[in-house]
Amino acid sequence: MIRVFCKNTGTFKEFQEGTMLLEMIDEFDFEKPYPIIAALVNNVPQGLKFRVFNNRDIEFIDYCSYFGRNVYCRSLCFLLYKATLDIFPDCKVMMRRPISKGFYCSVEKGDGTELSDKDIDLIKQRMSEIVAEAIPFHRHEVPIGEAIEVFRKLGHMDKVKLLETCGEVYISYYTLGGTADYYYDVLVPDAGYLKVWDLTPYRGGAFLRVPNRHHPEDLAPFFEQPKTFEVFAESIRWNKIMGLDNVGDVNRACLDGKATDLIQIAEALQEKKIVQIAEEIDRRYRSGNNARIVLITGPTSSGKSTFCKRLSVQLMACGLHPISFSTDDYFVNRVDTPKLPDGSYDFDNFDTVDHDALQKDVMKLISGKTVEVPEYNFVTGIREYNGKKLKLEEGSILLIEGLHALNPKLLDNIPDAGKFKIFINTITSISLDDHNCIPTSDNRLLRRIVRDFNKGAFSAQETISNWPNVRRAEVKWIYPYQEDADVLFNSAYLVEFAVLRSHAERILATVPKNCPEYSEAHKLIKFLHYFIPVSDKQIPPTSLMRYFIG
């Protein structure tokens, strides 16, 4: 017999060795508002068909949990792939990226045509049939060479290249109704669990809608993100030009000694974009509308500060005189900072910034007056005036950088014609393979973990623990204004994960296995193992990446 502790109930129960998680659920009495779809076993995600042979701590999870959503969405992607292949056996399905609270998918049919509305209806019908039949997902753990041959015979060279370079001995792949595919984490037991979804035509492909995070009986709301989509599409075009569709391609290039070339190309592309932005700011300023306020924002760890410095250099090359400050210097004194329900400070709240004082100072600056601007003392938590004075001369451009820079309330007395808005995000365009895209939030979390640790600010455990609060604040305060920007800048780096691996792995290894944060640390370590590590010696000192890795 084995002894299992259920975190959902805080109780122990005994089971026969080898009992499946699926068989344990009803033995524990706890409220289950939504179906249980997976579990954390000793803080490691496992599918419900996982058999337990030793004493373990178990937490059953549904769609409302972070890991539960990942399991559900991953399974939905396989369902879509299976149904599409059943209708169009010679097609190529590519799950491009999460967008608009769903997934954008492109399909290359054998005859070279795009999906029609009728095609999508046929795929939807087949998906519904598979769900109604509750066809099971079967997991197969095999030597990696065997898995490589499975996918080589299927012509899935994206998976072959990934598996050949990941360095594992054994891996698991899944089958659904005889169709094989690879996913880098667990799935639901069968397709019958996937009751809430929709598939609609979108930009020559299909959009896979998923359940609402808080009310999984309903679909998440859809909203257009045309500017974000175009930035992603531009990155995909460049990846194709370089022949780098997936991580396996990047790994091969690094093994062939081309890592330095990839770094230089990534730097050149970012610098080219910054030059274009500077030239557009210059054009607007000199066109007569006197647009001299540049607002720069983006989520945490997107690279705002370094971008601001590099943009300043290019503005000077245009003959302009950039003057910059951060909204952080206008933070209210710490005693006046808004608080979260648990009593901790809500540093990401819009009212953390004294926007009235900031707006008054900006109005004075653009009217030609000299203004003494504050400097926030993060040690004492007090806004200080230390004699720093600013004045806008002829040709001066004011750069304002911060989390809330694009919030329309920040400078609501200044017409939009006088502002140039820039939103920086980390839009990861590279995928593990055709069916496993990489969440942009993972990109930024890894940056944040490395930066916090190197600066001695927080441990990996502390950074991971606070990340849900950061994400909630971004959704509330930052992302609503993304599409309002005049330009979106993508700070994602083609070989970023390969460079971050050597920094992040050792830091993530410090997270104790017995804490809740280990689940995320384990996931990130497993994810980083797909990348061939690349030295950071060729990363230039002015790179956006350098700020995070030191």
Located regions from the model:
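Auxiliary tRNA-acceptor-end handling modules of aminoacyl-tRNA synthetases
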Residues: 50-69, 83, 92-99, 104-272, ...
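Hydrophobic anchor at the beta1->P-loop junction of P-loop NTPases
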Residues: 294-296
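Conserved nucleotide-sensing/catalytic segment adjacent to the nucleotide-binding pocket
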Residues: 332, 336-379
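Conserved NTP phosphate-binding and transfer environment spanning the P-loop NTPase/kinase superfamily
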Residues: 285, 408, 412-550
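Glycine-rich phosphate-binding loop used to anchor ATP phosphates in small-molecule kinases
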Residues: 359-417, 467-481
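Hydrophobic positions on the alpha1 helix immediately C-terminal to the Walker A/P-loop
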Residues: 307, 311
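Conserved lysine of the Walker
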Residues: 304
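Short beta-strand-centered segment that lines the nucleotide-binding/catalytic pocket of NTP-utilizing
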Residues: 317-335
